[in-house]
């Protein structure tokens, strides 16, 4: 859109052991604002929070605006050079609440051709409340990176697990292998998933 303008401003502030960050701006015609803060406890435990919102227009009334809030609260253990462990609670204000989700499922049942086999995995956050856990093992024996992550919905019986293995061939060359596992019963956000399990391999070379 040639008539849209884009601008952003960011502020950083340190209050004793707290790091605070505020950002606001307009990107692709959408106003956005966000806040984040973090602190380190006992030189090992990182506690952090992120809150953000952006302008949205109703799909039923283009002139009606809303500002759904997304928030994340997390705690991570970073007291070891061998691994990091994180647990997070994510509330997705842009996701579907129970009534909206039920309406979407009815629409899929009544008009399956409209969805054309599309999968809910365009985003793992279709609903609103999630728990996230991740474990990272960097440079195991100076040759491997290993990461395991899990996302679980608190509103239906669905979960997503991701395991990634990287082999450090050299300073600029990495061979990666990723495995994604999906769990979702009928009526969950992953009911219309396109796969239950997926394996992907990739090569990365930096110049």
Question: Language-model features: where?
Answer:
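Outer-membrane beta-barrel "beta-signal"
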Residues: 131-135, 167, 173, 181, ...
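Extracellular/periplasmic loop regions
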Residues: 34-36, 46-138, 149-150, 190-192
């Amino acid at each position: 859109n040639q008539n849209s303008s884009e601008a952003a401003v960011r502020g950083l502030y340190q209050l004793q052991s707290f790091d605070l960050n505020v950002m606001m701006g307009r990107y692709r015609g959408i106003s956005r604002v966000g806040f984040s803060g973090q602190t380190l406890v006992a030189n090992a435990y990182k506690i952090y929070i992120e809150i953000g919102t952006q302008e949205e227009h109703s799909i039923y009334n283009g002139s009606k605006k809303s500002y759904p809030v997304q928030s994340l609260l997390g705690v991570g253990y970073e007291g070891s050079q061998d691994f990091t462990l994180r647990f997070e609670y994510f509330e997705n204000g842009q996701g579907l609440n129970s009534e909206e989700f039920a309406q979407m499922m009815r629409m899929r049942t009544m008009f399956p051709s409209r969805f054309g086999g599309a999968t809910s995995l365009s985003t793992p956050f279709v609903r609103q409340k999630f728990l996230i856990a991740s474990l990272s093992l960097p440079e195991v024996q100076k040759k491997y990176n290993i990461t395991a992550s899990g996302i679980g919905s608190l509103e239906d019986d669905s979960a997503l697990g991701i395991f990634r293995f990287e082999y450090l061939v050299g300073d600029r060359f990495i061979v990666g292998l990723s495995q994604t596992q999906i769990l979702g019963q009928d009526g969950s956000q992953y009911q219309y998933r396109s796969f239950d399990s997926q394996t992907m391999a990739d090569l990365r070379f930096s110049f």
